[in-house]
Amino acid sequence: MAEDADMRNELEEMQRRADQLADESLESTRRMLQLVEESKDAGIRTLVMLDEQGEQLERIEEGMDQINKDMKEAEKNLTDLGKFCGLCVCPCNKLKSSDAYKKAWGNNQDGVVASQPARVVDEREQMAISGGFIRRVTNDARENEMDENLEQVSGIIGNLRHMALDMGNEIDTQNRQIDRIMEKADSNKTRIDEANQRATKMLGSG
């Protein structure tokens, strides 16, 4: 009888321990799910900010392109005016043959973004492991929830990986666009300075 009582006590203790571990494991999966959902929300906000920044860069580069077009017209007018005034100085052609001009405008992409962020894909079906994510012990609703939580965590982690790749691609694209904008801005400034000098010289000669 004493041995039976001891065995029952031991079994009850094992059951209590199993229940305790199941409760702790369930809470752990809930915390994991909350953390990855917060990370996903932060990732989405970051992608939205990058997209808005990309639109701003597009507008800036379009402005640089418009200045370039306007300067072509202004340089042509100055050249015609210079011929009329008997001046042969035409630094605009020399400027257009310079390395800086070719670098800024030679391969003008007109602000076209080379790559767009890929669509975030839910990978839960791909990541789900046949038979579930956990080894069953208590075989109750807690383990069902644990399995569901881990499946969601796995899917969100897959999404986060795609988000990270999208962010990296978008940042690389924007960095290249910023370099183009800087080159175009420098080229436009040089051309505006040259045009001002020519106009001043022609006015002075008049």
UniProtKB/Swiss-Prot annotation:
Residues 1-75 are annotated as: Interaction with CENPF. Changing P117A: Inhibits interaction with ZDHHC13 and ZDHHC17. The modification Phosphothreonine is found at T138. CDD domains: SNARE_SNAP25C (cd15885), SNARE_SNAP25N (cd15894). Residues 19-81, 140-202 form the t-SNARE coiled-coil homology domain. Residues 111-120 are annotated as: Interaction with ZDHHC13 and ZDHHC17. Palmitoylated. Cys-85 appears to be the main site, and palmitoylation is required for membrane association. (Microbial infection) Targeted and hydrolyzed by C.botulinum neurotoxin type A (BoNT/A, botA) which hydrolyzes the 197-Gln-|-Arg-198 bond and inhibits neurotransmitter release. Part of the SNARE core complex containing SNAP25, VAMP2 and STX1A;this complex constitutes the basic catalytic machinery of the complex neurotransmitter release apparatus. Recruited to the SNARE complex following binding of the SNARE complex component STX1A to STXBP1. This complex binds CPLX1. Found in a complex containing SYT1, SV2B and syntaxin-1. Found in a ternary complex with STX1A and VAMP8. Interacts with HSC70 and with SYT9, forming a complex with DNAJC5. The interaction with SYT9 is inhibited in presence of calcium. Isoform 1 and isoform 2 interact with BLOC1S6. Interacts with CENPF. t-SNARE involved in the molecular regulation of neurotransmitter release. May play an important role in the synaptic function of specific neuronal systems. Associates with proteins involved in vesicle docking and membrane fusion. Regulates plasma membrane recycling through its interaction with CENPF. Modulates the gating characteristics of the delayed rectifier voltage-dependent potassium channel KCNB1 in pancreatic beta cells. This is Synaptosomal-associated protein 25. The lineage of its organism: Eukaryota, Metazoa, Chordata, Craniata, Vertebrata. The gene is Snap25.
